[in-house]
A protein has these predicted regions:
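Extracytoplasmic, non-cytosolic globular domains
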Residues: 44, 198-207, 213-217, 221, ...
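Aspartic protease catalytic domain
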Residues: 126, 316-388
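Cytochrome P450 catalytic domain signature, combining two hallmark sequence patches
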Residues: 55-85, 158, 216-221, 285-301
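Short hydrophobic beta-strand that contains or immediately precedes a catalytic carboxylate
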Residues: 30-34, 38-41, 48-50, 138-139, ...
Length: 388
């Protein structure tokens, strides 16, 4: 269903999206306890955390390495202005394998002119992190179901014999306190165009774009092993009608072509914290096969790569009757971040899901739409934003 969305319920508070490492991620500025920090903007997780002064940096094998290896920006003071929460710690592992632990406490946090007082946040004192030397942490905008606080003081036993300490994260507190309407929207743009886009709280971005939106409901689906996610909203999960691929002939795949019980193969997370798109393996394989020349699967890396001058096929995601095409420059990552010196090839922006990775519409997709995360209506809306 297409709808003309002319105005949000309330005036919008906006802040710039700041591209990181050639658009492999996006950040926002926040005021945390009276100081400004740049943090990764992530709609695929829920916690707000900063690395603290004196933290311990480790490698993937949990061996201590110099703090510079974690590549954080400015570090936060190791205390909470509004107090530490007794017997509660922070422990999170992200989909790419990065992990962090620390403690929970309260701080006043401001984003885009909106301040939530005594927001529950984390200070990280132990981290395996592959940073960018700019961002100091991360701010998650997903549902509180995915928050990563635990009762106790020993993160080593979290997820075994400890109890989740679910809490209300920043964006949901801002909504619950009536500070913003129950929505936010994202207009992510390529940094090569001189900007990065905009995050709008409680309304729509102020940039120029096609304001005809297509809506689709959010779904409660347990895409990761989490009993809470089986009965509550967690990720911003949608069910597309399918995918359109134009090579020699037009091809279309969609969940209506398979058994109802396998529709979970098609659910997808809209996630600003993931660089690429991860799609059902047979679809990713077909997309990569129709490059000119065809992409190559690099077994050691577990990814598709191609010649950096290859021509991608036309590819679109079909959502509720509307085809959202992905700009070719987002389908093949040709900058420094996408170049593989060991093969001389470039990373493809569409990769297979599976092996614990759900279908994800990351920045490859989000740079081609304006996305409205309508929490109040339990739906998402998309407008095309392929060219700008």
């Amino acid at each position: 269903m297409e709808i003309a969305l002319l105005a949000a319920a309330r005036s919008s508070h906006t802040t710039a999206l700041l591209p990181c490492e050639e658009d492999s991620g996006y950040a926002i500025d926040i005021n945390f306890g009276g100081k400004t920090f740049e943090v990764v903007f992530d709609t695929g997780s829920s916690d707000l955390w900063l690395a603290e002064q004196g933290f311990k940096c480790v490698n993937v094998n949990m061996t201590s390495v110099p703090a510079a290896n974690c590549a954080f920006g400015p570090l936060a003071p190791p205390t909470f202005q509004d107090g530490k929460i007794p017997n509660e710690n922070f422990n999170i592992t992200y989909g790419d394998g990065e992990f962090l632990t620390g403690f929970m406490g309260y701080e006043n946090v401001e984003v885009a002119g909106i301040t939530v007082d005594k927001q529950e946040v984390a200070l990280v004192n132990y981290a395996y992190w592959e940073g960018d030397n700019i961002t100091s942490g991360l701010m998650g905008f997903a549902y509180p179901t995915l928050t990563s606080a635990y009762k106790g003081t020993n993160p080593a036993v979290d997820n075994t014999n400890t109890t989740d300490a679910l809490y209300t994260n920043w964006v949901f507190n801002a909504i619950d306190q009536g500070l913003i309407s129950p929505m936010f929207s994202v207009a992510m743009e390529r940094g090569s165009n001189g900007g990065g886009g905009q995050l709008a709280l409680g309304g729509l971005p102020s940039i120029s774009y096609n304001k005809t939106f297509t809506s689709t409901p959010l779904h409660i689906v347990e895409l990761i092993p989490d009993a809470n996610a089986a009965k509550n909203y967690s990720f911003y999960t949608i069910l597309p009608e399918g995918y359109v691929l134009e090579g020699a002939v037009e091809s279309f795949w969609g969940p209506q072509e398979i058994e109802v019980e396998r529709k979970t193969d098609y659910y997808a997370i809209v996630d600003s914290g993931t660089t690429l798109m991860y799609l059902p393996p047979h679809i990713a394989e077909e997309v990569n096969a129709l490059f000119d020349p065809p992409s190559v699967w690099i077994e050691d890396e577990g990814v598709y790569e191609n010649d950096c001058n290859a021509t991608p096929p036309k590819f679109a995601v079909r959502i509720n009757g509307t085809d959202f095409y992905i700009n070719p420059q987002d389908i093949l990552i040709t900058g420094e971040e996408g170049y593989d010196p060991s093969t001389g090839g470039c990373l493809v922006g569409i990769q297979p899901s599976g092996d614990g990775i759900p279908n994800i519409y990351g920045d490859t997709f989000m740079k081609n739409v304006v996305a409205v995360f309508d929490i109040g209506a339990s739906e998402m809306r998309f407008a095309p934003h392929e060219y700008y």
